[in-house]
Amino acid sequence: PVVGVKATLVDGSYHPVDSSEMAFKTAAMMAFKKGFMDANPVLLEPIASLKVTVPDKFTGDVMGDLNRRRGRVLGMNSDHHGKQVIEADIPMSELFGYNTDLRSMTGGIGLYEYEFSRYEQAPGDIQKKEVEARAAKVDKLDV
């Protein structure tokens, strides 16, 4: 979806022969496409607040995995039962398969919970990859 966009129609005219609902919709669509691209849009990705609870001996492996998944570790606290609670922000797209990977890293002991936090601008390489993937889908539909 496109968010944070405001459009104001400042001028227009009506002609009894050439004007129709379809003509106005087409004109609006063309104006939006031009204005949208002139505004240099960016792709936003959802970010989750993540808490991972793991035994002390697995902390390094889990933190390395979070970094590999583009996560930002915000802090780490001991729960005083030999476990660490790691808090991080991470793109939600990087959480696919995390349950399986965390269980593998921790021998089935690690737990995690997350919730949506906000949207952030995706890195340039991710934006490029997503735009190319969507363009390929559109090209397939045009065939």
Language model features by range: what are they?
Residues 1-143:
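Accessory interaction regions appended to the cores of large information-processing enzymes
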